Structures are given as C-alpha cells and as structure tokens.
Amino acid sequence: MELRTLLNKAIERRHSLAAITNCLRLVNGKGDGCDGLLIDRYHQHVQVQVLHERWSKRVDEIAQILISMMPVDYLIVKSRQGLDLNVKVLKQGDPKTIVEENGLKFEVDLNDGLNCGLFLDMRENRRMVAAACKTKKVFNGFAYTCSFGLYARHYGATEVINTDISKRTLKKAEDNYRLNGFEVSKDEFVTTDTMAYLNRAVKKENFFDIIILDPPSFSRHEGKTFQVKRDMPVLIRTALEVLRPKGRLFVSTNYSEISHAQLEEMLAKSLNTRRVEKLERVGQDQDFPGSNSFKESYLSGLWVKFL
C-alpha cells in the first residue's frame, strides 16, 4: 500500500479522539502497517520515531506527506540505533508547545530526549484512575511530570503526593499545575526514591486511599538499582502496607517481558493478608493498535480495588 494511503488511513482511524485531545499517536508501528515507524502528534508539533533503517531514507517523504495533511509548526525525527538517539529537525520552530487532554493542559518539549513530558498511551488510564480520586488521599510514585497527580487534583483529590528522583521533571510538573490554575505546594512534589518514600510512610503510618505506581524498567539512584522484573513484588507489597482498607492500586509497566498474567502473579505474591475485591487489566489507549504485540508498544497494567 502506498505510504500516503497508509498514513491517511491511520490518521482517519483516530478521528474520534479529536473530541478529547489534540495529542495522540498517529502511527503505531506494525499496528498500522508501518513496522518500525512511530508518529506522535502534539497539537501542531509532530514527532517521528524511526526504529528500522528502511524508514531512514524516507523521512523527508514522510515529513512532506504529514505537512500536506495537517497544520505542522514543528517536526522532529528521532532515530534509535541501539542506545544512540539521532535527532533531525525537518521543520524548524519552537520545540515546546501546550497540548490539551480531557480538559487539562500540559507543556511538552519535543527536543528533550525521547520522552517529551506526557506519555500518550496512558491517557485513558489517567482518566480512569482520576475518576476515583474525589475526596481521596493519593500517592503517585515514579511520577515523572505528574500527569496522574494533576488529573487527581482536577478530579477533586484532597491530597496528592508525587515522588520522583528527578528534580527537573518535578519542576515541569509544577509548571503544569500552574498552567491549569492549581496552587503549587512544595509538600506535593517530593524529590526522592519512591521505594524509600514508601518505606518511610510505613514507619510513619502514613496511609493513602489510592496508590499509583508506574516504575521504569530500570533505574539507578545513589548507588542503588531498580529492576522492575526483580523488584516489582517488593514495591507492591510495600505500597499495600500503606493502602487503606477499600483502597485502590494502579500498577503498570512497559517492560515487554512482563505480561498481564505475570503482573497478576507479582500482585498475588505481594498480598499478605490483603484481599482483592475487583481486578481489571488495563493497557494502552485506542491510538496504539497492536499494543503488546511488539516491544515498542507495550503496557501491562492492573487497576485493583481491595477489601
């Protein structure tokens, strides 16, 4: 199939999302018949990720097609070859822009590494979790730019604690809070290791109604390493020690070697005396067709209500 036809078909498939957001994945690799090609739209900014060399020679063509199909203020191509990230800007402009999602605003920066400030695949999960946050005390671990925390505040949470080891990303989170008219409390943004914070919370008997955990596959901080496949059960067990009765846990990973079934096994090993009332498997949003069939588009998540 001609490339223009493939791209147009992929874009049309996502037309219904226009009512709730102006940032979405336009092309999701082989899920859209374009194995090795990812295209994300952030309002009128476009990011193209090239994961296979066959697309490398066609990036100019891809850019021209996209610019002819929609308003584009800025277009950047990111090619991943092993651990190296090669960046090429094909339409110059300000790499920063403000996007909207379910009535909330977020600033993103497409020239800030591979992740620009908002994980698009988590859109529906953010809305789902936030809908349960009214009048609740919420803990958001591995918070990145705190999109879950911002949603929780928007939906009426009485208290939110966001933790992340990166002071820089938490500063971006504070900017997003202000962008949406929320006052920024320094107590709400804690630059710390999430596991360390949870261990302190256990000692202080600092309990939460809702806990959100979306850890990285691997991280290193102050000489300690976190490996999600090794450490997820301990992380969940510690979190459950400070989850109130009738509380809810959202836990997810984009590590392609952990399936939903394996994540459920990790949860089961971590329960101790806790009992599950309801468990729901969740994944990436609808603009990620083919999700979990290839490692570049992967998310296993659980939304759990406890007795």
Q: Where on the chain are the PLM-derived regions?
A:
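C-terminal catalytic and target-recognition region of SAM-dependent MTase-like enzymes
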Residues: 248-307
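Conserved SAM-binding motif I beta-strand of class I
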Residues: 159-164
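Non-catalytic accessory regions of SAM-dependent methyltransferases
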Residues: 1-43
